[in-house]
Amino acid sequence: MAIIVNLDVMMAKRKMRLNELSQKVGITIANLSILKTGKAKAIRFSTLESICKALDCQPGELLEFID
């Protein structure tokens, strides 16, 4: 079981680069890259909220549960 963060998919849909998202959200490119590559073990709700606002999406569009 795993929760996948589909950040790369949503960024591609919005035609947004990592550095642009980093500036909008206020998170380092390194930390966003960890989320994007699936290496993150956790994400704060405040971070998730900021990413969703910047990408104009819902949390369910970013997160996917795989059994």
PLM region spans:
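The alpha-helix within a helix-turn-helix
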Residues: 11, 22, 52
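Short alpha-helical DNA-recognition segment
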Residues: 16-34
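Residue-level detection of the helix-turn-helix DNA-binding "recognition helix"
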Residues: 12, 26, 37, 67
